[in-house]
């Protein structure tokens, strides 16, 4: 891919700033200015089963929510049926399990799809979920031309942060382009892709990296669509106009507002210069937002309400760069699964912003602001340069390893700033004194998932398989494989497969046979090493070296593993980087490992400690399984301590310790350097106690 011309954004007039965000003539509000319509109000939700989630959606819609945002469980996201060994402990945990068309019918029962705007956070299996959605809409009699919504479908960012990829980049891009070209012809009001900056920020991206990498990902997709030749030249602008974005908003209010204005300006320029889009409405940067969930604090979590409010303002105050849809996390997401009441609190926050304040009654209040103009231009200029760096490497696909290592390095820098106190987090590293919170009730403050839900979903799956026409399902799967081997668009055959009773895992396995699977780079090996000069880190290095000497080892060896399907690798990567900096020899093989693979690696690598990271809620089943398999491989957790990190309620942590876990860490344990010293101490204590 050719790079764009480098340098400053010369198209920005020096007298009135960036175009189109700050070009403005007239008063802030005319006498007859109508109040703007609010953004789509959504709550990201789904758990346990399709029927339970359907009931939740209907309650939220009755409370004033204006669109759906569907969270799928990890087996659905990664293409496994509920009875697959890799799905154990993960079914219905972080979202709703959708194993077949019957589940999709139950999920959408009583919700008229021709009147609903539905966002589906789904990527590797996005085509399959869209196929089932369209099949249900057809059954409802809803015209495909009237379906509105979004499939996230940004697989490139999955390689960089979220981790729910399946196939290699080439076939994954093919699935995306098939969805885009199908959408242009069949579901023209549907956004076939949400290019995501959200997860990049959580993975460590600076505002400049967030803008640059996201736009580079969008270029990779649009260039691939253009290369298919399936979209007539005169229709390509409308295809560009259906590309939407999913962004993040952090607490640096002015910087975040300026970042969104930079996004708006650069997308306008990019679509005009690279793709020749003349109609301004097709160059519009259309984006939805969820504010920063992983930035919420576990200590004094009630303060998160203020964080969420400020982050929401950053993407709603500026009319020229206002979000089209907004979903806000619950205040206690850093601690466990929020209750419906917690989600309602965030929903009411949106409604207060939209209906009680006057922010929708004015033109853009930042027009003419020299401060915002300057910050916007700074981000835009630097992002344009960084985007060219990526394009010069062959584009986003060719630069995956570069972008991943840059994100890991940026997150490590951010983590060190928090630990040193350079970056203040109220209630975490400063102002930690607190009164007891009336909201802090371990037994009552989280949603309780039904422990039998996984068994019921497996029974549901078995019943579905037993009642379908097996020959029709097999024939439909053959058609999927044939289309994958050729150049036929895969969406129509996927819709037919859904109607024939094919399951999520069967559809994904058919494509695995043709496309193969992929392991993304971890970025850990390329992250910059923290040099001498930090007293706490130097002290821990000395402790680690001392323990190694006393137990007769050249170096302490740590295995960092992520069992199950949880792809949120940021924490594991930072633990691996800090362990390396503290003097450990680190074995880190990436995400989505089976308990057996972790246990086998612990034995083969002759490690001194095993660290497990789980954020999906599957710890209760997966961790004991790892312990049992370690013992089967001759690795005694009493001699090789196992430590676990994640969003783990104290009651669960106590059970894990009873099962043989040496220590449990949660987001409250933010100081990784101190943690490394504690882990070294656990290794020495285990060595002493076992001789």
Q: What is the predicted function of each stretch?
A:
Residues 144-147, 190-192, 228-240, 271-285, ...:
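Flexible, glycine/charged-enriched surface loops at secondary-structure junctions
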Residues 64, 100, 141, 267, ...:
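Conserved, mostly hydrophobic/aromatic
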Residues 236-239, 277-291, 299-332, 338-359, ...:
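Flexible glycine/proline-rich, aromatic-decorated loop/lid segments
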């Amino acid at each position: 891919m050719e790079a764009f011309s480098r340098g400053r954004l010369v198209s920005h007039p020096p007298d009135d700033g960036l175009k189109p965000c700050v070009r403005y003539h007239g008063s802030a509000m005319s006498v007859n200015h109508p109040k703007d319509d609010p953004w789509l109000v959504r709550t990201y939700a789904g758990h346990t089963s399709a029927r339970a989630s359907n009931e939740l959606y209907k309650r939220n819609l009755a409370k004033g929510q204006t669109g759906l945002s569907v969270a799928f469980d990890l087996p659905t996201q990664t293409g496994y049926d509920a009875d697959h060994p890799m799905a154990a402990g993960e079914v219905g945990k972080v979202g709703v399990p959708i194993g077949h068309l019957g589940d999709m019918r139950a999920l959408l029962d009583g919700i008229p799809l021709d009147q609903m705007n539905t966002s589906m956070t789904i990527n590797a299996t996005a085509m399959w979920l869209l196929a089932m959605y369209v099949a249900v809409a057809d059954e409802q009699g809803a015209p495909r031309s009237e379906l509105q919504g979004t499939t996230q479908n940004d697989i490139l960012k999955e390689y960089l942060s979220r981790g729910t990829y399946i196939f290699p980049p080439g076939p994954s891009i093919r699935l995306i382009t098939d969805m885009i070209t199908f959408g242009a012809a069949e579901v023209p009001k549907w956004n076939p892709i949400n290019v995501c900056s959200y997860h990049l920020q959580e993975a460590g991206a600076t505002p400049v990296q967030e803008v640059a990498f996201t736009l580079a990902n969008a270029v990779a997709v649009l260039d691939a669509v253009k290369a298919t030749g399936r979209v007539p030249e005169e229709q390509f602008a409308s295809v560009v106009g259906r590309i939407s974005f999913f962004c993040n908003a952090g607490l640096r209010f002015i910087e975040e507002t300026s970042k969104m204005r930079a996004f708006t300006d650069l997308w306008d320029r990019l679509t005009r210069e690279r793709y020749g889009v003349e109609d301004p409405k097709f160059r519009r940067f259309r984006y939805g937002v969820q504010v920063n969930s992983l930035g919420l604090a576990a200590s004094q979590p009630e303060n998160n309400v203020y964080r969420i409010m400020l982050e929401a303002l950053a993407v709603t105050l500026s009319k020229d760069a206002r979000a089209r849809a907004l979903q806000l996390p619950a205040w206690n997401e850093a601690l466990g699964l929020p209750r419906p009441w917690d989600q309602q609190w965030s929903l009411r926050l949106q409604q207060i912003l939209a209906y009680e304040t006057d922010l929708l009654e004015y033109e853009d209040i930042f027009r003419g602001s020299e401060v915002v103009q300057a910050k916007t231009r700074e981000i835009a200029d630097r992002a344009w340069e960084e985007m060219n760096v990526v394009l010069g490497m062959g584009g986003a696909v060719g630069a995956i390893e570069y972008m991943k290592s840059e994100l890991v390095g940026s997150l490590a820098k951010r983590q060190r700033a928090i630990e040193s106190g350079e970056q203040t987090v109220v209630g975490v590293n400063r102002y930690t004194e607190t009164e007891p919170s009336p909201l802090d009730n371990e037994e009552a403050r989280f949603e309780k998932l039904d422990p039998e839900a996984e068994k019921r979903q497996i029974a549901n799956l078995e019943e579905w398989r037993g009642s379908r026409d097996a020959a029709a399902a097999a024939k439909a799967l053959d058609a999927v494989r044939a289309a994958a081997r050729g150049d036929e668009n895969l969406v129509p055959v996927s819709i037919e497969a859904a109607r024939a009773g094919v399951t999520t895992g069967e559809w994904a396995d058919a494509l695995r046979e043709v496309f193969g699977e992929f392991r993304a780079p971890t970025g850990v090996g390329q992250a910059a090493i923290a040099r001498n000069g930090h007293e706490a880190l130097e002290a821990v290095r000395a402790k680690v070296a001392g323990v190694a000497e006393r137990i007769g080892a050249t170096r302490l060896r740590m295995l960092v593993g992520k069992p199950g399907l949880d792809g949120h690798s940021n924490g594991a990567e930072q633990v691996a980087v800090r362990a390396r900096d503290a003097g450990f020899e680190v074995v880190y093989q990436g995400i989505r490992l089976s308990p057996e693979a972790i246990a086998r690696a612990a034995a083969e690598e002759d490690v001194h400690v095993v660290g497990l990271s789980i954020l999906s809620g599957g710890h209760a089943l997966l961790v004991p399984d790892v312990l049992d398999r370690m013992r089967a491989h001759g690795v005694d957790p009493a001699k090789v301590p196992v430590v676990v990190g994640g969003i783990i309620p104290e009651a669960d942590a106590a059970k894990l310790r009873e099962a043989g876990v040496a220590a449990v860490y949660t987001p409250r344990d933010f100081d990784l350097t101190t943690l490394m010293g504690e882990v070294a101490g656990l290794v020495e204590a285990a060595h002493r106690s076992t001789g």
